[in-house]
């Protein structure tokens, strides 16, 4: 695509060297649009799917009025949010009040720049893709803190403090889990990490993926991922029964929609990251000798992401909310020690004769 645009602007339109630069910029913009539009549509229908799944588990119907089987409900919700008035508390900080939602949403979009869907479908294939993801996603906590403080509300500020403390705490446990994957893969490039999962004793099958030899740390990662995205049962940052709606209690209309969009995009990002790091990415769960079913494809990447997202919804419909002190105790006294201990265990394992990743 990049070469096509560069040839178009340089040769066809006669812009020369300037056309090469313009073609590069245009190709990047087109790639960004190709990623963001399906992502936003996925968020819209993920909300619909969430309400349907939870309704089914609670013996309800879920959305069924707007359109056939309620399929147009996400668009009705979008129009409602777009046309609602964006109110602001009188004593709030106007500039920071509007910067908060933007700072929460921007990192969730920027993180997708390095997420590959197969060996070719990636915006930017860099060797420190995992480090970039950890760095860019950690910035979203600033948007939460700014929104909570700028609202000039005790409920918003308390929710922001809870959300930021929880996010920072579980980021440590999640990072420890991802360090284990880097150790066995020998790279922070997502394509290399996926390729490494096709090797080993059980190479070419579901049993060679990282979830099996790293199963204890895989569980630590999954729990940390739910807490990192402030989803149930770790959603104390917006506990309706305690602090109304957390850091975005004073937001309405389009400003609230930005927080909402950021939360669900982070969910999808975690699903993609889980697929790449532990579930083989675009690798097929079947041996390649099975023909087209065993061929690596972006289809398998999307299937695994959908499975992780369904797991998110199942967790929300099943488990009650934790108390805040229980969440912090689980993170600091259980998950973080397990994460660091497993790094040591894995290091010893890899230098022993029982190394599975040779």
Swiss-Prot record:
Family as reported in the entry's similarity comment: Belongs to the complex I subunit 1 family.
Report the protein's function: NDH-1 shuttles electrons from NADH, via FMN and iron-sulfur (Fe-S) centers, to quinones in the respiratory chain. The immediate electron acceptor for the enzyme in this species is believed to be ubiquinone. Couples the redox reaction to proton translocation (for every two electrons transferred, four hydrogen ions are translocated across the cytoplasmic membrane), and thus conserves the redox energy in a proton gradient. This subunit may bind ubiquinone.
Where would you find this protein in the cell?
Answer: Cell inner membrane
Sorted UniProt keywords = Cell inner membrane, Cell membrane, Membrane, NAD, Quinone, Translocase, Transmembrane, Transmembrane helix, Ubiquinone
Example GO CC term: the record gives: plasma membrane
- Its gene name is nuoH
- UniProt GO BP: aerobic respiration
Q: How does it sit in the membrane?
A: Multi-pass membrane protein
Transmembrane segment boundaries: 20-40, 95-115, 128-148, 168-188, 206-226, 253-273, 295-315, 334-354
Superkingdom as given in the UniProt entry: Bacteria
State the organism of origin: Neisseria gonorrhoeae (strain ATCC 700825 / FA 1090)
What are the EC numbers?
7.1.1.-
A single GO molecular function term of this UniProt record:
oxidoreductase activity, acting on NAD(P)H, quinone or similar compound as acceptor
Q: Which reaction does it catalyse?
A: a quinone + NADH + 5 H(+)(in) = a quinol + NAD(+) + 4 H(+)(out)
Tell me the Pfam families matching this sequence. NADHdh
> What is said about its interaction partners and assembly?
NDH-1 is composed of 14 different subunits. Subunits NuoA, H, J, K, L, M, N constitute the membrane sector of the complex.
Q: What is this protein called?
A: NADH-quinone oxidoreductase subunit H
Please give the HAMAP family that the UniProt record associates with this protein. Answer: NDH1_NuoH
Q: Which InterPro entries match?
A: NADH_UbQ_OxRdtase_su1/FPO, NADH_UbQ_OxRdtase_su1_CS
């Amino acid at each position: 695509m990049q070469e096509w645009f560069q040839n178009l602007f340089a040769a066809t339109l006669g812009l020369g060297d300037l056309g090469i630069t313009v073609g590069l910029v245009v190709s990047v913009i087109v790639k960004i649009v190709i990623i963001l539009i399906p992502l936003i549509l996925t968020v819209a229908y993920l909300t619909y799917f969430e309400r349907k799944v939870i309704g089914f588990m609670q013996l309800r119907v879920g959305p069924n009025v707007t359109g056939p089987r309620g399929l147009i409900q996400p668009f009705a919700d979008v129009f409602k949010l777009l046309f609602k008035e964006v109110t602001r508390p009188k004593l709030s900080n106007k500039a920071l009040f509007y910067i908060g939602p933007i700072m929460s949403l921007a990192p969730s979009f920027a993180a997708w720049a390095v997420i590959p869907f197969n060996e070719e479908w990636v915006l930017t294939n860099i060797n420190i893709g995992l480090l970039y993801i950890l760095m860019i996603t950690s910035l979203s906590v600033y948007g939460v803190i700014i929104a909570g403080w700028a609202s000039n509300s005790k409920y918003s500020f308390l929710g922001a403090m809870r959300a930021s403390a929880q996010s920072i705490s579980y980021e440590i446990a999640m990072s420890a889990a991802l360090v284990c994957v880097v150790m066995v893969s020998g790279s922070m490039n997502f394509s290399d990490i996926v390729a490494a999962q096709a090797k080993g004793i059980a190479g070419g099958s579901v049993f060679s993926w990282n979830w099996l030899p790293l199963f204890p740390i895989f569980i630590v990662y999954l729990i940390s991922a739910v807490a990192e995205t402030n989803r149930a049962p770790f959603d104390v940052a917006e506990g309706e029964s305690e602090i109304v709606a957390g850091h975005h209690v004073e937001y309405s209309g389009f400003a609230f929609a930005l927080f909402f969009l950021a939360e669900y995009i982070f969910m999808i990002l975690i699903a993609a990251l889980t697929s790449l790091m532990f579930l083989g990415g675009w690798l097929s769960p079947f041996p390649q000798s099975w023909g087209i079913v065993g061929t690596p494809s972006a289809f398998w990447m999307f299937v695994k992401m959908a499975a992780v997202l369904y797991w998110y919804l199942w967790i929300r419909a099943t488990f009650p909310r934790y108390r805040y002190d229980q969440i912090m105790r689980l993170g600091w006294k259980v998950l973080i020690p397990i994460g660091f201990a497993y790094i040591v265990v894995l290091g010893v394992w890899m230098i022993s004769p029982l190394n599975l990743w040779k």
